[in-house]
From Swiss-Prot:
SUPFAM superfamilies (alphabetical): GST C-terminal domain-like, Thioredoxin-like
Single annotated GO MF: glutathione transferase activity
Species this protein is from: Schistosoma mansoni (Blood fluke)
InterPro entries registered for this protein in UniProt: Glutathione-S-Trfase_C-like (IPR010987), Glutathione-S-Trfase_C_sf (IPR036282), Glutathione_S-Trfase (IPR040079), Glutathione_S-Trfase_N (IPR004045), GST_C (IPR004046), GST_superfamily (IPR050213), Thioredoxin-like_sf (IPR036249)
Alphabetized CDD domains for the sequence: GST_N_Mu
Pfam families in alphabetical order: GST_C_3, GST_N
Residue ranges annotated for the GST C-terminal domain, each copy included: 85-203
Full protein name: Glutathione S-transferase class-mu 26 kDa isozyme
Keyword annotations: Transferase
Function: Conjugation of reduced glutathione to a wide number of exogenous and endogenous hydrophobic electrophiles.
Domain named GST N-terminal: residues: 1-83
Length: 218
């Protein structure tokens, strides 16, 4: 039986997990709750046998998980993608945290009514954060070398999000531009991005000041 993956019908913090599943060509059944299905989720929430009921959830046979990072790490671990030794595993964990600094920075201001004001400070600091990844990729195809790991999909998603904040934010970072294109050119990712299953919008919940609503900005 295919694993079951549940979340809202938004990108949110689970888009990297979707990308990882697609890249691995994992068969999975996604339950994407739409904005008018809050009651449906409330009805399902305590019927799935989840120890800590929440979205996202991932049910793999009799093994049931919630929390986005636990889920993506579990899937990566099943495919021996968490590193071959303690140092490599620690580096991958470090990369997770570094990408999350960007993505969570967006989330901290995305729901605020003063988003346009707060965005200025975020974008002023963004080049410094992006430069660290640019330097990391100076002699690498992917963050951990020549093989894709789940932080690559986390970074791809973070770049996708910040480009909506400032479409010029990668202009000084050619390695990041190449990296983003490299991820998009992975065969399974290319197929997914062109499929009806791909969720382009919203980036956050529907009520977010930035990245919310039903349609992306033109």
């Amino acid at each position: 039986m295919a694993p079951k993956f549940g979340y809202w019908k938004v990108k949110g913090l689970v888009q990297p997990t979707r990308l990882l599943l697609e890249h691995l060509e994992e068969t999975y059944e996604e339950r994407a709750y739409d904005r008018n299905e809050i009651d449906a989720w409330s009805n399902d929430k305590f019927k799935l046998g989840l120890e800590f009921p929440n979205l996202p959830y991932y049910i793999d046979g009799d093994f049931k998980l919630t929390q986005s990072m636990a889920i993506i790490r579990y899937i990566a671990d099943k495919h021996n993608m968490l590193g071959a030794c303690p140092k490599e595993r620690a580096e991958i964990s470090m990369l997770e945290g570094a990408v999350l600094d960007i993505r969570m920075g967006v989330l901290r201001i995305a729901y605020n009514k003063e988003y346009e004001t707060l965005k200025v400070d975020f974008l002023n600091k963004l080049p410094g954060r992006l430069k660290m990844f640019e330097d990391r990729l100076s002699n690498k195809t992917y963050l951990n070398g020549n093989c894709v790991t789940h932080p690559d999909f986390m970074l791809y998603d973070a770049l996708d999000v910040v480009l909506y904040m400032d479409s010029q934010c990668l202009n000084e970072f050619p390695k990041l531009v190449s990296f983003k294109k490299c991820i998009e050119d992975l065969p399974q990712i290319k197929n997914y991005l062109n499929s009806s299953r791909y969720i382009k919008w919203p980036l956050q919940g529907w009520d977010a000041t930035f990245g919310g609503g039903d349609t992306p900005p033109k």
